[in-house]
């Protein structure tokens, strides 16, 4: 993705891979369709709550699964079974933001699962989540800038083509 962006901008800059931006591990839900994920999460949650599989209705599994996905999309609450180290993601964003020299512009490319933790650099994550959809859409762009030692988000999840109109 970074190569493509740099080519389109006709810019020749080095690309540095940073493991802090690597996509999260969705565990058993990796590469699965959303319907399957929703049912699996709902079933797993209900079984954990003591219900037996024979007593689980598909509607109830879907209802709970949708609720768990909504928590992920609205508050970054990691569903059961996903291999996500939230503290590592948060500290990675804080370390990365602190490492960017004043006056430099960086293009960071990552997935929505990782990007949803980037607002921690703002210092007001809960407020940000209350006013933004933290699920970054496919192809979405998030723009941050730093003034002094204070980061701000000027654009969140906008489609790239809208930047070039």
Can you name each region flagged by the protein language model?
Residues 1-59:
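Phosphate-coordination/substrate-recognition cap region in phosphate-metabolizing enzymes
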């Amino acid at each position: 993705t970074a190569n493509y962006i740099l080519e389109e901008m006709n810019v020749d800059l080095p690309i540095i891979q940073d493991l802090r931006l690597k996509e999260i591990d969705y565990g058993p839900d990796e590469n699965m369709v959303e319907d399957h994920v929703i049912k699996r999460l709902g079933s797993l949650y209900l079984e954990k709550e003591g219900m037996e599989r024979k007593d689980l209705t598909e509607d109830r599994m879907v209802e709970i699964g949708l609720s768990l996905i909504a928590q992920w999309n609205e508050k970054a609450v990691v569903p059961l079974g996903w291999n996500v180290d939230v503290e590592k993601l948060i500290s990675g964003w804080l370390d990365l933001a602190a490492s960017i020299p004043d006056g430099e512009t960086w293009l960071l490319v990552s997935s929505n699962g990782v990007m949803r933790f980037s607002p921690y650099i703002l210092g007001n994550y809960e407020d940000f989540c209350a006013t933004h959809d933290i699920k970054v859409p496919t192809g979405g762009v998030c723009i941050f800038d730093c003034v002094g030692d204070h980061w701000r988000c000027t654009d969140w999840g906008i489609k790239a083509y809208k930047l070039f109109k």
